[in-house]
């Protein structure tokens, strides 16, 4: 019986090539500036992209700049982002985050991140209340910074756990560290593409409640499928978030 699936023993480029056959090539969308990406990713925590993008668009249409958001009443911010999960909490934390950035650096921008190593940049971002590894990494990798950081969201984490690449209870930070160690030859764009491929796999095939193991291009190297079978993976899906 297979007892572990170690990405370090497998060429991640080969994994990406397999997923490229299953899914269309990920288009490189127009990048947001770092602060705008930060706000968008902040809103997107535990919220589908389509909903968080709508909330982000409403903020952009209502306010001229992020200074205006920082100075706006929390109730007004919350009303615009009410569709996202934990909207009241996010409204307060987003306002606080923008004000903290302005107080620390004199203005609301992330210019200082350009000269920092990725680890230092992640650390600085994660000092902001409400910011975890996913939001910090997305700010760096998805924005015009194009930083070499891998974004682990709920769908990606679920796939990595099921594969056995990380433990069943591994944190986002642990999954990030494991991927970055195994993908030491990947540049920022490679990590960007891998994220969206694994996210697509998690949403369309390795779904939370109804995993479609038979159609998964990576099923032969999936620890949970090998050990439990496709039926058990489907039944256990709700427990492996």
Per-region residue spans from a language model:
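Catalytic cores of DNA base-excision repair glycosylases
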Residues: 3-236
């Amino acid at each position: 019986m297979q007892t572990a699936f170690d990405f370090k023993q497998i060429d991640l480029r080969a994994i990406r090539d397999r997923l490229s056959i299953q899914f269309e090539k990920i288009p490189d969308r127009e990048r947001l500036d770092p602060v705008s990406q930060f706000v968008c990713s902040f809103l997107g925590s535990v919220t589908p992209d389509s909903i968080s993008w709508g909330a982000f668009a409403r903020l952009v249409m209502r306010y001229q700049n992020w200074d205006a958001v920082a100075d706006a009443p929390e109730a007004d911010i919350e009303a615009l982002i009410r569709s996202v999960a934990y909207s009241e909490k996010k409204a307060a934390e987003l306002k606080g985050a923008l004000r903290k950035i302005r107080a620390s650096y004199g203005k609301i921008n992330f210019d200082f991140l350009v000269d920092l190593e990725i680890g230092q940049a992640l650390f600085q971002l994660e000092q902001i209340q409400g910011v975890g590894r996913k939001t910090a990494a997305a700010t760096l990798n998805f924005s015009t910074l194009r930083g070499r950081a891998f974004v682990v969201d709920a769908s990606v984490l679920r796939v990595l756990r099921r594969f056995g690449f990380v433990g069943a209870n591994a944190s986002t930070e642990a999954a990030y560290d494991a991927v970055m160690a195994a993908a030491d030859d990947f540049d920022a764009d490679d990590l960007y593409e891998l994220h969206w491929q694994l996210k697509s796999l998690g949403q369309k095939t390795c779904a939370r409640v109804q995993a479609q193991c038979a159609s998964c291009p990576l099923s032969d190297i999936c620890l949970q499928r090998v050990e439990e079978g496709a039926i058990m993976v489907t039944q256990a899906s709700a427990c492996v978030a």
